[in-house]
């Protein structure tokens, strides 16, 4: 069943009933099972189906939430507080997307009440390039928020620690630096399972899509990513999607109009934030933007 109320935040959850299944953690394998009850809901404080979720929270064994920023969304906070109030949070696997900047004391206290935590962290880049993409947030504050969570959340509760960047011309050269940073955290805090999963920009026609970069840049990126597929043993690295996409489009030669469209989109982006791409983007991207084809 689907419930859509302004698309504020979506919940994907599973119930366990004695007559249908044994308790088990949400997984891809579960989706193939005939007795698996799988539901998607959108939060609304006035929706009967949402209230039904809260009223029957004892039956929920796993929930996946996406946003908006979940840790600022009233529905997600309400769900966590209700589960804690009913003393059932310890039975729930909590999976959610977050930009990782809101790991404050109150939220960490909530997270420590849940049985299992799966973090899907929407972090698109690192250092100054991150600041460019996530203005006005700065990298030092993000790093402090992440470390605050990792220092205070019970490590036994953390099952998955996943970074989920979206690749574009803005950050393509910095994904490996971000991966190295995540590897450092996984090792430093002895986390159970790290995942680095890169998504493609959508829709594909967006002017900052990597398909519109020069053939030379695309080949360089393929080489960069392929060098890092198999060298990590303590983290799941998913770069094949990006590599395959680049290979599919590596022979596409961008037109002058493609270059101008990308430049225009980036400069409009800059004006809205009082920034300049020359200060943040990789030299190869800057050269591509400023060299007529």
PLM regions with names:
Residues 2, 78-82, 183:
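Amphipathic alpha-helical scaffolding segments
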Residues 1-45, 57-74, 86-105, 112-144, ...:
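Core AdoMet radical
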Residues 44-48, 80:
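Eukaryotic beta-rich interaction modules
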Residues 49-56:
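Conserved acidic catalytic loop of the alpha/beta-hydrolase fold
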Residues 75-81, 104-111, 174-176:
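Distinct, well-ordered alpha-helical segments
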Residues 116-120, 140-290:
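Conserved C-terminal portion of the radical SAM core fold
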Residues 82-88, 152:
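Short, acidic, metal-binding catalytic loop of nucleotide-sugar glycosyltransferases
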